[in-house]
C-alpha cells in the first residue's frame, strides 16, 4: 500500500542511426483478451478448460497449454490439443490492416463486424510446420470486430501468434486495447480475497490443542507432531455452506466455536466428530463434511485430539496433509475437489484484468527473506507463515502457486523481489519462471512433466525491487538506507562514485542499482532475446519525481553505467532502457472533500488528478514505458471511517473510478494496476469480500476494458518549436534553468506525433554539436537528427557534452 499522502561524449559512443518504435495509438483486443476453449486431442470433445488469454503469442513446451496443477490445467500428458479463441478488437485508425497468423500446425482466422452473424474467412491453413499467413482487410476506426481463431496441434510442442499491422501501425502482437492490472490478495488468515479453494492454505500455524496461544512442535512442513488446534479464521466474513475436511491419519475433531456440524455418510455428529469416524484404514485418511450454518462475527478454530499419523503411530502424534475445501459459493452444499487449487470467485475477478501484481502475495513490505531456503514452499501446511520481527504478512506465498495462478487465469505477472534477497534467490526465481520447480528448487532446463510448471509462454514478467523504498512509513525505507550506508562504508561501491555524501542519495541510488543487478541476473537466465520481450524490469518512484526519486535513480544509472558524465566508469556503456523496461509511480486519486459530512458531499466535490503526467515525462525521457503500480479512486486511505467506506461503495464511485482510469491514460500512462482485489477497505474492488463483485468500482473497470483507452492529451504536438517551459523539469537538478552546466546534464520534452513520418530534431543552442540528441532513451546523433517517428508519444532528450556548459531555450522539430 502507498504512503497516505497521495495528493501529493563516452555516452555518445553508443549512438544509433534509428530509433525503436514508440507505442502506437490505443488499439487492440477488448475485455482483457481472447476467451479460449482448450480440448485434449485433435478430434474434438469436451472442453478441458477455458481461459481468457491476455494475448495469443504462445510457444508451447512439453508441459502443454495448461501450466498448473489443478486437474483441468494439468496438461503435460496431452499428446496434442485443439484451441478455439474468441475476442473483439477495435482499431484506432481507418485504414487497411494486415492480420498475421504464425503457427506450427493447422490454424484459421475468421472475422465479422460485431453485431453481425456471418463470419468472413481471412486465413485457413491446414498444413503443418512453421509458417506465417497474412491477410489484409480495411477496418474502420472505433468499429469493433469479432475474431475467431482455430488451432489444432498434433504434437506436444508448438507455437501460435496473432498479430496485425497497418501503414501507420508497426507489426505487433494484438494486445489489450486497455491494459489494466490488479494488485492481488494476500494468502493470510482473514484476507477477503480467499484465493485458495483450500481454506487451510490461509490458516495460521497449528497451535496448542486447548490454548492457541501456546506454540507446539511442528515438522519441517508445518504439520503438528501432537494434538493441536488450527486457527482457521478470526473474523466472521468467511462463507457459510459445506466445507470438505480431509487429512492423513486419525483424530477427534472439535468445532470449538460451534459454527456448524460435522457430517459423515449422511449422519450429523454435531460439533464433535469422534475419532475413527470417516477414517479409511486402507488409505490412512479421514474425510468428513463440515456444514457451517452461520459464521457471524466469531472465529473458527478446529481441534484435533487423540491424533495418530498412522495406524502404528502413538496416540498424540499429530496429522498431516489437512485440506478444508471451501463451498463453491456462499451457502453451497457442494465443495471444491481436493486437487483444485484456486477459489473460482477469485479467478473470476482476475479474469477481467491483463496482469496481476503480487506485492502483497509475496509479503514485500515486511519480508526480510535473504536466501532461497527461507521462502514459503507449496508443500507447506499453510501459506500464512509468520516470522518474528517480519511484517504481518509473514513470508508470503509460494512462487509455484503464483505461477499457477497466472497460468490458470492467463495473466501477466508483476513480481517484487524482497529487500534483502541475495543474488542466488534472484537467479532461482528467474529459473523457476522459465523452467518450473520440483517444489523445492527450480529446474535448470525445460522438463517434460514438471512438478510445478513454468510460466506460460505468452505471459510477460514485470520485475520490481521491493516496494516503495522511498516511503518512510515502511520499515524497509530505513533498512534500504542502512544497506546503502554499509555498502559505501565497505568500499568499492558505485553509490558514491562522484563523492556524494548524502545517505538519502545513496539509498535512492541503491534502489535502481539493485534493480539493474536483478535485470542482469534475469538476463543470464533468459538471454538477451528474453529481456524486454518477456522479462521487463521496472523502476518505480514517488509520485511525479517527488523528492527527486526518479531523477536521482535514472541519472545515476546513466551517469555511472552509461558513462554519461564523460568518465569511463564501465567498459561497456548502456542506456537506462537496456536494464529497465518500465518506470512510474502510483496513480491514486481521491475526493476533493474526503472528510465531508455525507457520502453525497464527498462524491460531489470532484476529485484530484493522478500524478501520471509527471511520471510519464520521466519514463518517456529515458525510453521507458510508464507503469502505474498501484492506484484508482479511493476515499479514506489506509484508515477509512465508516462514512468513507460507504463512499467507496456508493453508486457515484463508478464515475469516480472511471474518471481515475481515463485520466491515467489521458496523462500518458501506459499500464495501470488497480489496488486491490478485495477487502473491507477503501481499496477493495470486490468489497467487503470476494463474493461481492458487483460493486460500482468493478462496473467502472468493466466499462474501461470494453473499449479502447483514451488517447493522451498533454504532450506537445510536433512538428513545432517547443519552448523550454515545456521541458517539464526533466533534468537532474529538478529545476529549469536552460543552462546545462555539467557534462551529462540534460533536458527532456515529451512530444506527440499524430501522423508518422520523417522529422528533423535540433535545438537553438549556439553550438548544437555540444548536445547529444536522445530519442526514446537511445542516443541518435550530435546536434541534429533526421529520422522516422511513429505515431504516439516520444521522449526527446538533449544531453550536454561540453565541460564549458551549453545554453538553450528551444527544441526545434520540423517535418
Residue spans for each PLM region:
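Non-catalytic accessory regions flanking glycosidase/transglycosidase catalytic cores in CAZymes
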Residues: 181-465, 470-603, 609-635, 639-642, ...
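Extended extracellular/luminal ectodomain segments enriched in beta-structured repeat modules
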Residues: 90-98, 142, 240-242, 753-760
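Extracellular carbohydrate recognition and processing domains
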Residues: 123-133, 279-289, 772-793
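Bacterial N-terminal signal peptides that target proteins for export
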Residues: 1-11
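Extracellular/secretory pathway-exposed regions associated with glycan biology
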Residues: 27-183, 719-742, 746
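Short strand-turn-strand beta-turns centered on an Asx-Gly dipeptide
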Residues: 112-114, 265, 774-778
Amino acid at each position: 500500500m502507498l504512503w497516505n499522502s497521495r495528493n501529493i561524449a563516452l555516452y555518445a559512443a553508443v549512438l544509433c542511426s534509428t530509433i525503436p518504435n514508440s507505442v502506437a495509438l490505443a488499439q487492440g483486443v477488448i475485455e482483457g483478451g481472447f476467451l479460449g476453449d482448450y480440448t485434449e486431442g485433435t478430434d474434438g470433445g469436451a472442453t478441458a478448460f477455458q481461459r481468457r488469454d491476455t494475448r495469443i503469442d504462445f510457444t508451447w513446451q512439453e508441459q502443454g497449454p495448461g501450466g498448473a496443477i489443478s486437474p483441468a490445467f494439468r496438461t503435460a500428458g496431452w499428446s496434442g490439443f485443439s484451441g478455439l479463441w474468441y475476442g473483439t478488437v477495435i482499431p484506432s485508425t481507418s485504414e487497411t490492416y494486415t492480420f498475421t497468423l504464425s503457427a506450427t500446425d493447422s490454424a484459421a482466422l475468421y472475422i465479422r463486424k460485431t453485431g453481425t452473424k456471418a463470419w468472413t474467412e481471412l486465413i485457413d491453413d491446414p498444413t503443418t510446420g512453421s509458417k506465417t499467413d497474412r491477410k489484409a482487410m480495411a477496418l474502420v476506426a472505433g468499429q469493433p470486430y469479432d475474431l475467431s481463431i482455430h488451432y489444432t496441434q498434433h504434437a506436444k510442442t508448438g507455437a501460435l501468434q496473432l498479430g496485425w499491422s497497418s501503414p501507420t501501425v508497426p507489426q505487433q502482437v494484438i494486445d489489450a486495447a486497455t491494459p489494466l492490472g490488479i494488485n492481488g490478495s494476500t494468502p493470510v488468515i482473514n484476507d477477503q480475497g480467499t484465493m485458495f479453494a483450500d481454506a487451510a492454505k490461509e490458516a495460521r500455524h497449528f497451535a496448542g490443542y486447548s490454548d492457541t496461544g501456546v506454540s507446539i512442535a511442528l515438522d519441517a512442513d508445518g504439520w503438528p507432531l501432537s494434538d493441536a488446534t488450527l486457527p482457521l479464521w478470526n473474523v466472521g466474513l468467511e462463507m457459510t455452506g459445506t466445507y470438505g475436511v480431509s487429512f492423513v491419519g486419525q483424530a477427534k475433531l472439535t468445532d470449538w466455536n460451534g459454527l456448524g456440524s460435522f457430517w459423515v455418510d449422511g449422519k450429523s455428529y454435531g460439533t464433535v466428530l469422534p475419532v475413527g469416524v470417516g477414517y479409511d484404514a486402507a488409505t490412512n485418511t479421514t474425510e468428513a463434511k463440515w456444514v457451517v450454518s452461520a459464521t457471524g462475527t466469531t472465529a473458527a478454530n478446529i481441534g484435533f485430539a487423540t491424533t495418530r499419523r498412522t495406524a502404528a503411530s502413538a496416540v498424540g502424534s499429530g496429522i498431516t496433509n489437512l485440506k478444508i475445501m471451501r463451498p463453491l459459493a456462499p451457502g453451497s452444499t457442494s465443495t471444491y475437489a481436493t486437487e483444485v487449487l484456486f477459489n473460482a470467485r477469485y479467478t473470476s475477478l482476475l479474469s477481467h484484468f491483463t496482469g496481476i501484481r503480487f506485492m502483497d502475495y509475496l509479503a514485500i513490505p515486511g519480508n526480510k527473506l535473504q536466501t532461497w531456503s527461507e521462502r514459503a514452499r507449496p508443500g507447506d501446511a499453510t501459506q500464512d507463515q509468520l516470522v518474528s520481527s517480519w511484517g504481518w504478512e509473514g513470508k508470503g506465498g509460494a512462487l509455484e502457486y503464483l505461477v499457477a495462478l497466472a497460468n490458470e487465469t492467463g495473466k501477466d505477472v508483476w513480481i517484487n523481489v524482497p529487500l534483502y534477497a541475495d543474488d542466488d534467490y534472484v537467479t532461482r526465481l528467474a529459473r523457476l519462471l522459465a523452467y518450473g520447480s520440483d517444489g523445492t528448487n527450480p529446474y535448470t532446463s525445460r522438463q517434460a512433466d514438471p512438478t510445478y510448471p513454468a510460466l506460460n509462454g505468452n505471459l510477460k514478467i514485470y520485475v520490481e525491487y521491493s516496494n516503495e523504498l522511498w516511503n518512510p512509513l515502511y520499515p524497509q525505507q530505513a533498512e534500504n538506507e542502512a544497506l546503502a550506508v554499509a555498502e559505501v562504508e565497505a568500499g568499492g561501491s558505485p553509490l558514491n562514485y562522484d563523492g556524494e555524501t548524502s545517505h538519502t542519495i545513496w539509498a535512492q541510488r541503491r534502489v535502481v542499482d539493485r534493480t539493474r543487478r536483478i535485470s542482469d541476473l534475469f538476463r543470464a537466465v533468459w538471454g538477451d532475446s528474453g529481456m524486454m520481450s518477456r522479462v521487463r524490469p521496472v523502476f518505480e518512484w514517488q509520485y511525479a519525481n517527488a523528492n527527486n526519486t526518479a531523477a536521482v535513480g535514472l541519472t545515476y544509472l546513466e551517469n555511472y553505467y552509461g558513462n554519461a558524465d564523460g568518465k569511463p566508469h564501465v567498459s561497456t556503456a548502456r542506456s537506462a532502457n537496456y536494464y529497465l523496461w518500465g518506470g512510474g509511480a502510483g496513480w491514486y486519486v481521491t475526493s476533493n472533500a474526503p472528510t465531508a459530512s455525507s457520502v453525497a458531499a464527498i462524491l460531489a466535490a470532484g476529485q484530484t488528478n493522478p500524478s501520471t503526467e509527471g511520471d510519464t515525462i520521466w519514463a518517456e525521457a529515458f525510453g521507458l514505458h510508464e507503469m502505474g503500480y498501484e492506484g484508482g479512486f479511493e476515499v479514506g486511505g489506509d484508515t477509512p471511517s465508516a462514512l468513507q467506506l460507504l463512499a467507496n461503495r456508493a453508486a457515484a464511485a463508478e464515475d469516480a473510478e472511471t474518471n481515475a482510469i481515463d485520466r491515467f491514460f489521458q496523462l500518458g500512462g501506459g499500464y495501470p494496476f488497480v489496488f486491490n482485489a478485495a477487502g473491507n477497505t477503501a481499496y477493495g474492488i470486490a468489497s467487503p469480500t470476494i463474493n461481492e463483485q458487483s460493486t460500482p468500482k468493478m462496473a467502472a473497470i468493466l466499462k474501461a476494458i470494453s473499449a479502447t483507452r483514451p488517447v493522451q492529451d498533454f504532450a506537445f504536438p510536433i512538428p513545432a518549436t517547443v519552448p523550454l517551459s515545456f521541458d517539464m523539469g526533466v533534468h537532474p537538478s529538478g529545476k529549469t534553468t536552460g543552462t546545462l552546466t555539467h557534462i551529462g546534464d540534460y533536458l527532456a520534452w515529451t512530444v506527440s506525433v499524430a501522423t508518422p513520418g520523417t522529422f528533423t530534431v535540433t535545438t537553438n543552442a549556439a553550438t548544437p554539436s555540444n548536445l547529444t540528441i536522445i530519442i526514446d532513451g537511445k542516443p541518435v546523433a550530435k546536434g541534429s537528427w533526421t529520422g522516422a517517428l511513429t505515431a504516439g508519444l516520444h521522449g526527446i532528450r538533449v544531453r550536454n557534452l561540453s565541460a564549458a556548459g551549453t545554453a538553450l531555450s528551444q527544441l526545434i522539430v520540423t517535418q
